[in-house]
């Protein structure tokens, strides 16, 4: 009888131990900084077509390609969507980051409807230098995007140097994004 109780409790004990390991792993580390195998490597080759019908000052807002990110200037690439509630909270931070850091900010409407993306930018403003569409999410997969928002710092050579997962806050901009941008600018200046 003692053996049958031990036999029945063994799977429960194993489950509790494994669940404990997962709980510890989930609580440790910064969830906004998932490791990316792309750090230090060239941004994946992709062309993000312009968001149909998006205008700024009467002119079509262009899409962009990876080559646009390798023209000697540090830039930011932000994957967002109109259906993403944290993207609404983060959106004003993008304009602030563009101004304070003096970088171009490229936006990717990720797995989003074009009309909904245009309404979002009409309502909250357009901080982007260019806005590309990734309707299917295939290009985002190449970039290692898990969801929205996700933001990348790309150095002047077109290499990804930092990835931020989740919405940026004033604190994350100050403690993470601005130092990553400064390091990328210094690195680009030294290689010139």
Regions found by a protein language model. Name each.
Residues 8, 122-127, 133-185, 191-192:
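Thiol/disulfide oxidoreductase modules built on the thioredoxin-like
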Residues 76-77, 105, 151:
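Hydrophobic beta-strand anchors of alpha/beta hydrolase catalytic cores
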Residues 99-136:
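Conserved segment of the thioredoxin-like fold in thiol-based oxidoreductases
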